[in-house]
């Protein structure tokens, strides 16, 4: 059994997960928490190479099953090379996306079989699930508007998808929230960043048993 604490950050495009994480890190450091932050797909060399293939805007012909299997391959390598060692070392590991993204994007978004995705996630992770998942919820239109207004953000293949896909993805997350409400906590990402950070901090500290 791992000795650390695994947190995943989830949400539709433009929910602001990365900005919240950047604001949280100094707070955690003051608390003396040993933290590893990482992302999917990516996090390690092989994973980052797979990420480039998945998100390349020119790869418009990518089949949905190909996309899913690339994510799963990246997940496995990332887990064994980076995440599991950090958990064994007793660290707090915060992942920008994990298993729920596959269900939301490839399951609900692409229409692939949810049971097959669950099996692949189980196969890739040996059954590992986050201790806590923070789901940053935002209306699809607002999230995409944020992306369009952020000139510093690199546009990827998923950003170019139609509104319908993104709506299905959000519905997927809301379905997961209903199914696994004991693990997944919904955070209103439409609020000002400072409020979102404070809410996230409170939920995280409560989940880890840290004093606020």
UniProtKB/Swiss-Prot annotation:
**List of residues binding ATP:** 11-18
Q: What is its EC number?
A: 2.7.4.9
Reactions this protein catalyses: dTMP + ATP = dTDP + ADP
Q: Does the keyword Zinc-finger apply?
A: no
Q: Which UniProt keywords apply?
A: ATP-binding, Kinase, Nucleotide biosynthesis, Nucleotide-binding, Transferase
For this protein, the record's InterPro entries field holds:
P-loop_NTPase (IPR027417), Thymidylate_kin-like_dom (IPR039430), Thymidylate_kin_CS (IPR018095), Thymidylate_kinase (IPR018094)
Record-linked SUPFAM superfamilies: P-loop containing nucleoside triphosphate hydrolases (SSF52540)
Instruction: Please name the GO terms that the record assigns under molecular function.
Output: ATP binding; dTMP kinase activity
Q: Which GO terms describe its biological process?
A: dTDP biosynthetic process; dTTP biosynthetic process; dUDP biosynthetic process
Q: Which residues form a coiled coil?
A: none
The Gene Ontology CC terms held by the record are: cytosol
Nucleotide-binding listed as a keyword: yes
Q: What does this protein do?
A: Phosphorylation of dTMP to form dTDP in both de novo and salvage pathways of dTTP synthesis.
Query: Which family is annotated?
Result: Belongs to the thymidylate kinase family.
Q: Which NCBIfam families match?
A: DTMP_kinase
Q: What is this protein called?
A: Thymidylate kinase
Upper lineage:
Bacteria, Bacillati, Bacillota, Bacilli, Lactobacillales
